[in-house]
Every structure is written in structure tokens, then in C-alpha cells.
Amino acid sequence: ASVAGHHLQWALAQGGDLSKLVIDQDRDAQGSKRSKHWRQIYQPPYDERLHSTRFVTERTLAFIEAAHQRQAPFLAVCSFPDPHHPLTPPGKWFDAYRPEEMLLPASRHDDLKDAPAHLRLFKDIHPKDQRNWVSPCGYGNDALLAEAIAATYGMIGMIDEGVGEILARIESLGLSEDTIIVFTSDHGDMMGEHGLFLKGFMHYRGTLQVPLLIRVPGHAAGRTQALASTIDLGPTLMAACGIKAYDG
């Protein structure tokens, strides 16, 4: 996607080409690979080292290094924009996963006859009005859905690489036994389930369930099926740090 804000300033400082970084959805960029099915699946025209995932990774690494040098406690919120539409994994990540090898959800051709009324109504709206936003891959276009899933996996793969670098840096600085690590997300994605894509007003597991991994030094590993919410994270982490929880 088009680069802006602090990310843009950082990318320019790395030698990025402004004409490639700032283009509306990169639709006019020459030479970038793109899907013939949906305009929001394409390879950005700039080098992968200038991508937002690299920006967030490197800023997080620098922040942790600076805190370590000051011997100061730190809270680092490492928030990657991806995976998110437009589906634009850069460089090698665009071809990292083959669409023809993607497993498609069994419910992708759901006619939504048992779904809430607002979803049944939505399905009948003309594609040019709404469906292209929330369900471009639904209602029979398996080729597009496979491309979308492959591109999403590419974005996730790049994030996984960045998270690995951050964890390795924490380890190399000798901070792993004094640092609580949380991995989670703000929402999921339908990824073609029930013929829907992206997120929105669909209260299915695909959008509601997110990964939640918490590592607290000195605590044994375990799993739970108990209902939890990201709203619980603040009080939980404050308690783990011996800080009085806030009201509200």
C-alpha cells in the first residue's frame, strides 16, 4: 500500500524512491505483480526492506536496544499493520506461497440461508456497491480466494521473520528471563469462510478468535480453553508486574 507518515520518512532515509512509495494503492506502479481477479492483491513496487513490517521490526529493535543501554524498564508495543488488505506482501514474500496449494474453507459456498438477516441482505447487494469491500472472494471465485490466502500467508511469513528477530535480540541482550512477551491481534479474518472475506459485522469465529500467547518468566507453560478477551490483557500484565490495576 502507499507509504505515509513516520514510515515514509524512515523509508526515504533508507534511500527509498518517493515515486514508488507514494502511489494510490500502487495501481499505477509499473512492473509490480498483481492479481487479475482483485485490484487489492499485488506486489508493491518498492524493495521489501522498505515495507511497513521492516519499519516496525527495526524501530522495535532500536527501542529495546536503547532501553537496555539505559538499564530502564520498557514497554514495547510492536504493532504490525499486516496482515491486512490490500494484500501486498513485498519482494520474495509475494511468491512465497502458491495459490494452487492453498486449502480453501469448506463453507466458502455457503448460501447464508441460516445466517442473520443482515448478512443475507448483504449477499444480495450488487458487487459494485458493497460486496467488493467485504467479500471480494466469496460466492464462487475460488481462484481469487486462493490468491488472497496465499498473499495473506506471505504477509504473515514476513511478520514471523520480524518477530523472530525481536525475540532473538531480547535473548542476546540477556533480557529473556526478565521480559513478559505477548503475541496477539485485534481481530481475525473470514478468509473465505461462509463466502465472506476480511472483517466487519460478521460474528463468526473467523473474525472473533485471535491468537493469544503470553510468556511470563518463571511460569509453567500451559493452555486454556477459557473465554478470554484482549480487554483482559491490561489488568493481567499490570498484575504480573506488581502494578495496581486501573479502574474501568
Language-model regions: role of each:
Residues 4-58, 63-72, 77-178, 182-230, ...:
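Active-site-proximal cap/lid insertion segments
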Residues 1:
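His/Cys-centered metal/cofactor-coordination and adjacent catalytic loops
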Residues 233:
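Catalytic core of tubulin tyrosine ligase-like
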